[in-house]
Design a protein with these regions (language model features):
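Nuclease catalytic cores that cleave nucleic-acid phosphodiester bonds
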Residues: 2-5, 9-124
Length: 124
């Protein structure tokens, strides 16, 4: 199973003060995804609106960004990734964004709620 994670949607699924330090929240999500992906042998791509400077990197998961930061740009990037996938039915998109869920679902991907993924990779 391939996972595509709507990064900021998953970060925002838990009101833990992430908005005070966006970079730390993104970095923490990446660390949690890395640990989970390596322990479960999952193929994970996390998508953000734009890269940070300096960029966040990982040797375990793929970190992707929209080509240009704009409203819904990460969503559009996720849809493009599902659309161009050889087997979209083998993709699980982690998001709670209703419009994004509808778009990727129409392409054959499965949607996994953001809060459920957050609880899976970072139990309270």
């Amino acid at each position: 199973m391939r996972w595509i994670v709507d990064g900021m949607n998953v970060v925002g699924s838990r009101p833990d003060g992430w908005w005070r330090n966006r970079r730390l929240a993104m970095s923490t999500l990446i660390e949690k995804l890395e640990h989970w992906a390596s322990s479960q042998s999952e193929d994970v791509t996390v998508v953000f609106e734009h890269p940070l400077s300096p960029p966040l990197e990982s040797s375990v998961i793929t970190i992707a960004h929209a080509p240009k930061a704009a409203a819904n740009s990460a969503d559009d990037q996720i849809v493009a990734m599902v659309r161009t996938a050889e087997n979209p039915q083998d993709i699980r998109v982690a998001t709670s964004d209703r419009m994004l869920s509808e778009r990727v679902g129409a392409l054959g991907a499965t949607v996994y709620p953001a809060q459920r993924l957050r609880d899976l990779i970072d139990p309270r």
